[in-house]
UniProtKB/Swiss-Prot annotation:
Belongs to the MurCDEF family. This is UDP-N-acetylmuramate--L-alanine ligase. Its EC number is 6.3.2.8. GO terms for biological process: cell division; cell wall organization; peptidoglycan biosynthetic process; regulation of cell shape. Pathway: Cell wall biogenesis; peptidoglycan biosynthesis. It comes from Colwellia psychrerythraea (strain 34H / ATCC BAA-681).
Amino acid sequence: MIKQTHVSNSSNNSTNSTAAQVPEMRRVKRIHFVGIGGAGMGGIAEVLLNEGYQISGSDIGENQVVKRLRALGATIVIGHQAENVVQASVIVVSTAINSENPELVKAKELRIPVVRRAEMLAELMRFRHGIAIAGTHGKTTTTSLIASIFAQGKLDPTFVIGGLLNSAGTNARLGSSRYLVAEADESDASFLHLQPMVSVITNIDADHMETYQGDFEKLKDTYIEFLHNLPFYGLAVVCIDNPVVRELLPRISRQVITYGFSKDADVRAVNYQQNGAVSHFTVEVEGQEPLEMSVNLPGQHNVLNALAGVAVAKDEGVNDEAICKALTEFEGIGRRFEKLTDFSTAAGDMVLVDDYGHHPSEVKATILAMRQGWPDKRLVMVFQPHRYSRTRDLYEDFVEVLSEVDCLFLLDVYAAGETPISSADSKSLARSIRLRGQIEPVYVSDVDKLPQLLATQLQDNDMVITQGAGSIGAVARNLADHSLLHTRCSVQPDAQSEVKGDK
């Protein structure tokens, strides 16, 4: 298990681990992050800070990532202003930052190098044994599991994760070993910058298709290119249960280990059972004794994520005892099927869960896990669609999967910088689900009214889940932190959008 460490604001942080600095970055003194509050950006910033670099950054608002980095010694300002970058050696930008941002404009004027997040991650990985986890779904969970298994196996990895690893209290840490475990982002094809020693592909699904000009074949080609960034002695660990991954196997010219429930998987799960939030299964590997395991995560999709961790760990020589212990004691990740609270109302006792899944496949997996683990509970979902383009492109899939819950509340689309698209909004989605005839969805035009609307629908023994990748995480926290039925909940607007009422 990765333990939490004390975070303090110390002037010694800037000289904390200079021996671990990237050798060829010796001329770099101050690294400035534009959009430092994002999980991926903040994670890389934390590792670089602990390597001894001066870190500064800017974002549009305070969050836990910003507060943590400040406590570690980073200089962070709220708001994007040209003067923020004047003393920087290099600028790191997230994909959410557009070219007209005043800090980018000033950096180009001063000829300060501007790199994307993945390029900086690639530099961290260059002189380490990199393990990069790619795929449409499950990257954060799989990365967290691998980091936890390696830590339990005394390998002390550096890790950069797109979510909060609960046992560590952070999403990034500088380890003492040669291992670096990190997510590889396909959303903008920036994972092609990475040159790891081991690459994992959890699955391939249609998402972020604007990056690939709407061409699924181009998306598949890009995954093959990612795998072929491995050296000839590298290893591809891939989920053979995913039909697209299976289709691509003949095109992979690197050593491959497959995993899954399929009979022909190299690392195979059998005898799957789910008991509440715990999944039990047996791992079979040819030539080895079967290994009974439990992972503190619900659902078959999470067993697949665990299998990826088992496959990578076994290849790196982690013993079975450490693997089993890490999975059994795994404390989860923030916003990945995270139980927030048990609560009581006039209607009875209930539980509140929060989940990041925002693609129809992810929502479907969550619903299945809940049905299997808690078959006696009614499922009440509060869903916030993420991006108008995704809602448009996967509209019928959303209608189908969201119709499978018992009670549905739909918040307005989280735009993430996009312009609204006609008939790809939550009101249209609610109308289509209603016409399907399975459930009667509730469109929530004013998020402040959500507690009162929930109160009219809740029943004893319900399981309430807040689902989505946008500002709904703040809604979930407010519901958990206050009385669900008597306290108004609000959402802090992000840089791109606000949740607006229909008045």
